[in-house]
Amino acid sequence: FVNLPELMRIYKETADIQTSDMLDLPVPEAKIIAVESELTQAQKYYLEELVKRSDAIKSGSVDPSRDNMLKITGEARKLAIDMRLIDPAYNLSDNQKILQVVDNVERIYREGAGDKATQMIFSDIGTPKSKGEGFDVYNELKDLLVDRGIPKEEIAFVHDANTDEKKNLLSRKVNSGEVRILMASTEKGGTGLNVQSRMKAVHHLDVPWRPSDVGRILRTFKIKKNVEVTDNGKIII
């Protein structure tokens, strides 16, 4: 950035900036607990290939139109979540994170049954597809959670609420506990969606590009109890 101090000085002439710390806003307490996912053999092998490709790109021996660091970064993000995002021929056993997320979501679901506590799962990768269009993370998570005994009616995708009326209805269902697990991307669920009334946990499967997108339910006035948030397979309590 150039002339940033000057820009901020001009901005402050017309803006009144108040942070949550300055206002002493009530927010729930949070403690971060890292839950690591071990690489499977399939992930290790593919990661080694990405390193080799990266070295080739740095040496200039590869045409950027055929392979480049942006492509490698995208594949690495997919690898970290589920290998089937790279190639549907891989199996569930070639991944650990998905099952860890399912374990955490089910645990919190059972623990919060009395209060109808709700949860959100954020993933910007592997968003829902129509049947027959290939593998996606959202439907895989839903199927695995249903296999654990969670009613499918209590699981929803924010992507299905494609009108204001449907979004308002979805918000009411989540706030009432009728829907207890909501999956969303950062774009569709990060702001402007008021579903915090019973929210107990938020799980981030991938790392958002902006740090401010992590821990959304900590920035609401409506939460009065401690919460759990997961970031990239890590649980934050």
Task: Label every PLM stretch briefly.
Residues P151-T186:
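Conserved helicase ATPase core of P-loop NTP-dependent helicases/translocases
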Residues G126-F157:
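Conserved helicase motor "Helicase C" RecA-like lobe of SF1/SF2 P-loop NTPases
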Residues A117-I125:
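Conserved RecA-like ASCE P-loop NTPase motor core of nucleic-acid helicases/translocases
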Residues L23-V51, T186-I237:
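SF2 helicase/translocase ATPase core recognition
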Residues G114-K116, E178-V179:
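Short, high-confidence coil segments that cap the C-terminus of an alpha-helix
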Residues D16, A42-K44, K52, K78-I86, ...:
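Short, solvent-exposed loop/turn segments at secondary-structure junctions
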Residues F1-N91, R107, I237:
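Inter-lobe coupling linker of SF2 helicases/translocases
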